[in-house]
Amino acid sequence: RDRSPSRGLGDVYKRQGVKMGGQPGEYPTVLAGTIFYGGHNIISDELTGDFDKSRAETLVNDMVEMSDVTGNPCIVQVFGQTEEAIVKYIEYIGDICDKPFLIDSTSGDARVAGAQYADEVGLTERAIYNSINMAADKSELDALAETDISASIILGFNPMNATVDGKMAMWENGDDGAYEKGLLEVAADCGIDKFMMDTAVTPLGQGAGIAAKTTFAEKAKWGYPVGSGIHNVPSAWDWLRDYKKAGNKTAYTVCDIGANIVQVMTGGDFVLFGPIDNAKIAFPAVAQTDMFIAEAAADFGPEAVDCLLYTSPSPRDGL
């Protein structure tokens, strides 16, 4: 395969009917909801991957329905704790819907097992690896390279330099030579040519705002689709967790869903919005944000595409 990444400001990737990228206001934001996450109440055994199929299907269908209504494409973020579990989950998601899916785990062995299974059964056109990052070892990368998976999240986490420059350097040149290669080159060596650039959001007070700022820098330099799992910011905010425990659950939900708006307003093309259970509230929030951006960008072009809830303003609206 040609392992050279494409380059061009405002790159638009198309995967299983999902368009991602472009200029602000051009395409609707892509939302990825996580299913089978740790502690998910539809799972009966996280090690073997036993779960309630009926409830899982309802959650997936709810997200797909919200995607159809708003025009915001969706991705199923499949998390599995073990090799056995993630293979079961991917098999199930592959059967019940036709949407792209993320292969996600805290275990490198599980991620590889998921990638290999997707390759074996012909699901690579829908599969997105999560993720290629500075901690990935050679065996994992070599195994990924043996598959036909061509899309991956590229995590810009830099533990030694959490600045915008540090994140950009991790992608470009391995943090100015601290690592043998930059993550973009590592990804290309694995056969990846569709990059989803994750700005690696950290807790408030530890660089959360820097990650949002990195969105602008990445779009300006490379133009690859960019986003993050920014919903992790509220979950790592000690004060908010305590406030939630004190009986203010609604406030937590507002901050959790609202965090996605921040990512979109800073030029993000995708958000990993957290539990798929929140699809019915995450999609309207992001769709509204997309409409704000599309209106703001209407004078500059390009024209908004596939934003089902967006109506272009008439000249009179500007008076």
State where each predicted segment sits.
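Single conserved hydrophobic/aromatic residue that forms the stacking wall/gate
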Residues: 1-13, 310-319
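Active-site beta->alpha loop and helix N-cap motifs at the rims of alpha/beta catalytic domains
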Residues: 31-160
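N-terminal amphipathic alpha-helix/helix-capping segment at the start of soluble metabolic enzymes
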Residues: 7, 11-43
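Catalytic alpha/beta core domains of metabolic enzymes, predominantly
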Residues: 147-286
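Solvent-exposed alpha-helices and their adjacent loops that cap or buttress functional pockets
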Residues: 21-24, 94-95, 119-123, 144-147, ...
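Short, basic, helix/turn surface patches
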Residues: 131-133, 182-189, 255-262, 296-309
